[in-house]
């Protein structure tokens, strides 16, 4: 089977990037070619659909440090992004509404991709991938999370998207968390920092090398030949409309707007 590979990113505008993700998914029709998209975001925090920004992140800290706030179309928790993490999404036809099997299949593709790079990765929770930590050489024992994901589905189509930490600023990632009491900030930030890791903590690779491994891993796991393509006029038009009416508005990004406007 042939698929579409989209290298479509707007690093300086995370909100526009999310509009593209939703537009590509909503434009997809059952039987269309599967889509694999790669993109990055400059410093920003993306909250999940059901979250309220002021409850999840330190808005004052974000403002002082020039970090953009955005809210995505799917659920899940708040995620910090910068140019050191790699985002990717998959849209494909579906005959069922089983979201669990979707996450398992996508996680399998990611794990296979990371093993191409020489990483001993394995699925963590349903929506993330971790790397075992060597207790003899690492201070923190256990597992460290390097990727989280979210998804959506409707009749005939499924969307899955993920963010992988390649060489992200993990100190900044920890600092943007919302902490109820200021005196606990350092403790919670340290705890968060100890639970996550970059791919480059384990292997010396570039963003491009990780992307190429993911293309190969998804192609082999899903049995799809992804070929580079461009966004369609329909997808572009819907993305612009979604950005203007939803993703660019404070009501949406703060988590106060619940109804669909497009």
UniProtKB/Swiss-Prot annotation:
Gene3D superfamilies registered for this protein in UniProt:
Bira Bifunctional Protein, Domain 2
Name a GO molecular-function annotation. Answer: lipoate-protein ligase activity
InterPro entries assigned: aa-tRNA-synth_II/BPL/LPL (IPR045864), BPL_LPL_catalytic (IPR004143), Octanoyltrans_LipM/LipL (IPR050664)
Q: Where in or outside the cell is it found?
A: Cytoplasm
Amino-acid positions noted as binding ATP in the UniProt annotation, renumbered to this chain: 72, 77, 80, 85, 132, 135, 145, 149, 163
One biological process term from GO is: protein lipoylation
What reaction does this catalyse? L-lysyl-[lipoyl-carrier protein] + (R)-lipoate + ATP = N(6)-[(R)-lipoyl]-L-lysyl-[lipoyl-carrier protein] + AMP + diphosphate + H(+)
Q: Which residues bind Mg(2+)?
A: 137-138, 149
Q: What class of enzyme is it?
A: ligase
What pathway annotation does it carry?
Protein modification; protein lipoylation via exogenous pathway; protein N(6)-(lipoyl)lysine from lipoate: step 1/2; Protein modification; protein lipoylation via exogenous pathway; protein N(6)-(lipoyl)lysine from lipoate: step 2/2
Chain segments annotated as coiled-coil in the UniProt record: none
Q: What is its EC number?
A: 6.3.1.20
Return the Pfam families for the record.
LplA-B_cat
Name the CDD domains on file: LplA
- What's the stated role of this polypeptide? Part of a lipoate-protein ligase complex that catalyzes both the ATP-dependent activation of exogenously supplied lipoate to lipoyl-AMP and the transfer of the activated lipoyl onto the lipoyl domains of lipoate-dependent enzymes. Can also use octanoate as substrate.
Subunit info here reads: Heterodimer composed of LplA and LplB.
Q: Please, what other remarks does the record include?
A: In contrast to E.coli, where the lipoate-protein ligase is encoded by a single gene product (LplA) with a large N-terminal domain and a small C-terminal domain, the same activity in T.acidophilum is dependent on two separate proteins, corresponding to the two domains of E.coli LplA, respectively.
What is the recorded name of this protein?
A: Lipoate-protein ligase A subunit 1
Per the UniProt record, the source organism is Thermoplasma acidophilum (strain ATCC 25905 / DSM 1728 / JCM 9062 / NBRC 15155 / AMRC-C165)
Coding gene?
lplA
